[in-house]
Each structure stands twice: as C-alpha cells, then as structure tokens.
UniProtKB/Swiss-Prot annotation:
Catalytic reaction list: Specificity similar to that of papain
UniProt cross-references to Pfam families, sorted A to Z: Inhibitor_I29, Peptidase_C1
Organism: Carica papaya (Papaya)
Enzyme's top EC category: hydrolase
Active site: 159, 293, 313
Glycosylation site positions: 86
Protein name: Chymopapain
C-alpha cells in the first residue's frame, strides 16, 4: 500500500497547488481548517486525513483517494475564497467536501414535486391561518419540544419523506403532547405515487399518512433503500393526521403566520455549491428557485439585524449548524431565498 509520502509526491507532480494566504477571520472549529493548512501539499494531506477520520471516509483504492483529495482541495479553495467575501454565512469542510457539485446533486438533490394531479386542488381560501397577522417576532419549534433529532437520508433521494415526517411529528406533539420519531422508510416503501429513493411528492406522502397513519421509526426503521411495503406486517399503533393544506405561494406573511403555529414542509433549490458546503450563519445564496430538495421549516428569528427562517435538513448533524440552516428572509424576492416560499404544506390533526 502506498505511504502518505508517496501520495504526496504523486499529487505534487500531478497538480500545481495555488496557495491562498487570505486573512479569513473564520474560526477553525467553524470552517474546519486554518490558513496554515493551505501553505503546503503536506499540510493539505494531513488536513484531508483528519477530515477522513472525522467523517468516517474509506476509499476502495489509492487512485480513488487521490481523486477525492483533488476534489477536496478544490472545494477547500472555493470555501476559502468564499469566506473572504464578508458574507453573512460561512462555508466549511462538511461531509460533502470530497464530492464534486455534480456528484452531490446526483446523490442528494433531484426530483421533488409539489403537486400530484390525482389529488384535490387547494386554493388560498382553504388556508387555515389566512387571518393570522399578529404572530411573534421569533419562534423555534425545537425549543418547544416539537422537533426530533436531525436524521440522515443517506444516498437516497428521500428528502420528501423526511420533510413530511418532520411536519407530522411536529403537529402530533403540538396536539397530543407526545413527540414520537416516525418512519420515513414507510413512506419510501408505501407511498405508491412517489418514487422511493428517486424522489417524491409532498402531497401524496401527506395523504398517505392521512389515509393510513404511519408507524414509529423503531417499528419500521430507515434503510436508505426502497423495499416492498411492509406496513401491514408491522405491530403497534400508528400516528395519523386528519389532512393537510397548502400555504399560499410566494407570500412571506402567510408563510410566517403558518410557521408560527407549526412546522412546515417546504421545497428549496439546494443544488448549488454554497448550499452543499454551508457550515453556519444566515444563508442568502447564491441560489435560484428551481426547487430540487425538501426540508422542514421549524422556526424563524433575527440575529445581528438579519432575519431568517430555521430549516431542518436531512443530511445528518455534520452538515450546517448541527443539521440546520438559517435561511435569509425578506430577500426582496417574493419567492424567498432559494424559493422557500414557493411550495409549503402543513398537516392538521383534529382541527382545520
């Protein structure tokens, strides 16, 4: 097996390292590197090895490790250049730092859709919170005990299931007082209108829970693959909802009015490199509004004069702020930062 010194020589001969000696004020523990790490190929290799250990990365061959190192190095340079721009957020060496942006998009974002033609059309008159105009300046459903720990969808395009389940977990806690971790795998296997690990619908997954209920994740654990539906074989009670409704599109007031009352299933454009490598702070792009990823809005607030929405992601706790992102609101775009106001749904349980 090749030694680290031989890897260093191979990479050094194959590539020309461009040294960036910026004066980034980012803390090492925030972004995962220091400026000293950029001064030599040896320091970069040491950084890569420590990053691999932290994120449990194992590669099948020395060629694969060299290839991943080169992507890691390129991403690090992009991170460092971005962090010098005095943005309201930091990028960092998260678990996606060895993936090209194309690889990242293929594995972790993709097909999600807000509507399924076989279901009822919802108009603004059906919106529960249309008369809510006086809502608190901030709310965090995590602090209210209505949010389960951050989960990880893995290399399965099941974000739609995680987003739906998080909203059902939230409304179940709000109505019954019980916070239960529910089964995303049941939706992946059993929502026949969605496509398992290849994407899915907010609407049909919510309708599935309304029609059938959903088991806890302990009874029906997540496996990051689609299998035959086994819901009828599982014991124990299910959590059900009465139905679901849509938040009027492209309206921040309606969005915040609903979010003040419960977590929301939302879609965003998450395929850009800044979103991939986000570490902390209030994210304001660049990103577009071509929706490709489902997340859960679990609160909103203000920090240092910057207003934001708290979104819970399904990429594990090593992405972002322990699995969360603060997404800028009042962006000047009616669709919201990354299109967050375009497609939002919420379940209801025992009230309309």
């Amino acid at each position: 097996m090749a030694t680290m010194s031989s890897i260093s020589k191979i990479i050094f001969l194959a590539t020309c390292l461009i040294i960036h000696m910026g004066l980034s004020s980012a803390d090492f523990y925030t972004v995962g590197y220091s400026q000293d790490d950029l001064t030599s190929i040896e320091r970069l290799i040491q950084l890569f090895d420590s990053w691999m250990l932290k994120h449990n990365k194992i590669y099948e061959s020395i060629d694969e490790k060299i290839y991943r190192f080169e992507i890691f190095r390129d991403n690090l340079m992009y991170i460092d250049e971005t962090n010098k721009k005095n943005n309201s957020y930091w990028l960092g060496l998260n678990g996606f730092a060895d993936l090209s942006n194309d690889e990242f998009k293929k594995k972790y974002v993709g097909f999600v859709a807000e509507d399924f033609t076989g279901l009822e059309h919802f108009d603004n008159e059906d919106f529960t919170y249309k008369h809510v105009t006086n809502y608190p300046q901030s709310i965090d459903w995590r602090a209210k005990g209505a949010v389960t720990p951050v989960k990880n969808q893995g290399a399965c395009g099941s974000c739609w299931a995680f987003s739906t389940i998080a909203t059902v977990e939230g409304i179940n806690k709000i109505v019954t007082g019980n916070l239960l971790e529910l089964s995303e795998q049941e939706l992946v296997d059993c929502d026949k209108h969605s496509y398992g690990c290849k994407g899915g619908y907010q609407t049909t997954s919510l309708q599935y829970v309304a029609n059938n209920g959903v088991h806890t994740s302990k009874v029906y654990p997540y496996q990051a693959k689609q299998y035959k539906c086994r819901a009828t074989d599982k014991p124990g009670p299910k959590v059900k909802i009465t139905g679901y409704k849509r938040v009027p599109s492209n309206c921040e007031t309606s969005f915040l009015g609903a979010l003040a009352n419960q977590p929301l299933s939302v879609l965003v454009e998450a395929g850009g490199k800044p979103f991939q490598l986000y570490k902390s702070g209030v994210f304001d792009g660049p990103c577009g509004t071509k929706l490709d990823h489902a997340v859960t809005a679990v609160g909103y607030g203000t920090s240092d004069g910057k207003n934001y929405i708290i979104i819970k992601n399904s990429w594990g706790p090593n992405w972002g702020e322990k699995g969360y992102m603060r997404l800028k609101r009042q962006s000047g775009n009616s669709q919201g930062t990354c299109g967050v106001y375009k497609s939002s749904y919420y379940p209801f349980k025992g009230f309309a």
